[in-house]
């Protein structure tokens, strides 16, 4: 079956955009084909710095014929209705329509519309220019003389040529006939910018790949990654070193080269006095190079005075000039970093605190200096809850942001916290304080490590709670996909800190403590909404671990639930209980009772929330259920008070036999009004008894 080959050849595409652009190209073209009824066997898109390419295999040469029956108005309908029908169906007169008789609706007109299938190449000639013109680049540009004309093409970088061929492997493919802003689709592409810049004629994908390889272009980004990683490891191994692997850098570098050639450079050993993270950040950020690790006798990471760079060409001198040029730049950058390091060490963190008053955190939330004071006060209050020393927690929080005004963090913001730890250690701060300065930002994401040191936990919680409470107090909350202040991440960080450390943290109390640092704002205006936000984040966190979101809703629906650790334990106990036969049957009994109550309360316009009257019990099953409810409620309440949620579930499980017997033997809607009301009150007592652990009405399934 025929294949499509499409290549869009341009100036250099930013590395960060390439993978998404390739996926967008594949999806846009294949979706457009499927919408028109053209199926295919497979599709794969590719990206290099200078081209996007798409191969779609197994397309038909022609679309299927379409036969459609379109129902029209009744025979004898008004002329306007008939004319509208003829126009929409593309008929010239009623003679072209068929009359169909229906026993119920009478006779009506039907138009039989037959459309022959279109040639695939003609459909592609419509789809491809539309996709190219409307391509969703994050940033795009116009260029040349055509850029002044309305509707001219926008592309990420100037587009030079288009390859678009279609046809079976056994025949010569045809050119897909279209042009965009004077660029005619054809069979000509170009090789590597320096190694093989001449034109290359390609007509099918099977020829396209080897032709590019001969022209020093590796089309597949994953293969470029593999080449870089394999060669870098080999170079390091040959020197007795280990490559410090970096997935993000590897992805970026693979998007910077079409013909990757790995080389090794070095720098003066004196620069190894700088913290290894600084060396890595310097070489990574400025030169897109990988650092190397030297063998260590003490188990601590020690960098080597060497680095791996990736060139986009195989130079005639073996890369000597390229290496020398990179070494000069790395030496200059590391000299700057060493200057920052030596300069920063001369100024104690404590002395830097006044400068934080000049950094605005948010126009409505004050400066970083004011924020530090709030975080320090909150950390001292939270310290007893996590087993931390209040003095150490307050001191760590006070110094936690001081490195923001250092030279090093000014140059490399991603090193905030880490540099604070280094400077704190050098200045003789206790280890717990130095560690907390680094770790108070953690966890930064779902896979990031959670701090376990008590002082670190106290400061990390204080930092995140201050952020959340502050933004809720000024009513700047995440909306849809927008979360510019990473508040979802902060809430998830609080959840992970609490659960990982078994921290008993009543959130409403923490909100009140956190908001105390904000003038003229009380927690009552936002506490419920912020608690709901935590509930949503907890659902996401537990759902990723396999928990049911409806059980979280059921527990949060009980008033006063703001202890995340106890909520999770209650959810876990509820889930285990509902997996048992007793749990499933009790849930079924609850639903039956709730449904009866809902119907009868709506019909009667009243709630049956009075206590059942034992004097009105006429059947033993009523007395048995009432007694069982009294006993189960007492045992469940006692178990919940002792935080024994499994025990509370066991207490509720004892209700199953009397509930089953009640529904088997008792007619709830008795003719006697008093008897009926009392039995409905008994069902309400069952409904309320389950609320000792959760709102069973929120449970799905």
From Swiss-Prot:
Entry keyword Iron: no
Location(s), subcellular: Cytoplasm
Superkingdom, taxonomy of origin: Bacteria
GO terms, biological process: arginyl-tRNA aminoacylation; glycyl-tRNA aminoacylation
SUPFAM superfamilies reported for this sequence: HD-domain/PDEase-like (SSF109604)
Any coiled-coil regions, as ranges: none
GO molecular function: arginine-tRNA ligase activity; ATP binding; glycine-tRNA ligase activity
Cellular component aspect of the GO annotation: cytosol
The protein's Enzyme Commission number: 6.1.1.14
Family statement drawn from the similarity comment of this UniProt entry: Belongs to the class-II aminoacyl-tRNA synthetase family.
Protein name per UniProt: Glycine--tRNA ligase beta subunit
Gene: glyS
